[in-house]
Amino acid sequence: MSRVAKAPVTVPNGVTVTQNGRQVEVKGSKGTLSFNLHALVELKQEEGKLQLAPAKESKDAWMQAGTARAVLNNLVKGVSEGFERKLQLVGVGYKAAVKGTVVNLNLGYSHPIDYALPEGVTAETPTATEIILKSANKQLLGQVAAEIRAYRSPEPYKGKGVRYSDEVILRKEAKKK
């Protein structure tokens, strides 16, 4: 039985949740997001709270209810506060610049890399070695951050590469003669 599904999702002021069949739409100041409820999950709306429950008592239904609750909570938080992810570029000559919806990366290759941001994600570069990604959609934000990091993931000897700001790189010692 999922303990996550038992906790209600609190809906702050300024956020509206509408349900049309299995489609749930969440609107707020940062945008509009939607997702499809699983057939084994039911959604009940009470004043300022959303309660998810399984449609029938089974292990799979409780698992789906817990997942739906976590996704719905991320949607509510995303349209009200938004999410952000910081990336750091560590290495000589590694730098980034944002031009509109394109992030231009110089990561030690013979050519610069132009990464086109998907709709719903914005980027800014306070310094040449730092990228801040912002979005209302947590899943999309994580996907974009992972794709940018994959161009030059951190290596364990010098720690050079693109890393998350809160990431700890396990360092290896160089071979001794």
UniProtKB/Swiss-Prot annotation:
Any Pfam family the entry gives: Ribosomal_L6
**Record's GO cellular component terms:** cytosolic large ribosomal subunit
InterPro entries linked to this entry: Ribosomal_uL6-like, Ribosomal_uL6-like_a/b-dom_sf, Ribosomal_uL6_a/b-dom, Ribosomal_uL6_bac-type, Ribosomal_uL6_CS
GO MF, any single term: rRNA binding
Under SUPFAM superfamilies, the record lists:
Ribosomal protein L6
Q: Keywords in UniProt for this one? A: Ribonucleoprotein, Ribosomal protein, RNA-binding, rRNA-binding
GO biological process assignments: cytoplasmic translation
Gene3D superfamilies found in the cross-reference section: Ribosomal protein L6, alpha-beta domain
The UniProt subunit note reads as follows: Part of the 50S ribosomal subunit.
HAMAP family documented for this protein: Ribosomal_uL6_B
What does it do?
This protein binds to the 23S rRNA, and is important in its secondary structure. It is located near the subunit interface in the base of the L7/L12 stalk, and near the tRNA binding site of the peptidyltransferase center.
Family statement drawn from the similarity comment of this UniProt entry: Belongs to the universal ribosomal protein uL6 family.
What's the name of the protein? Large ribosomal subunit protein uL6
- To which species is this protein native? Acinetobacter baumannii (strain AB0057)
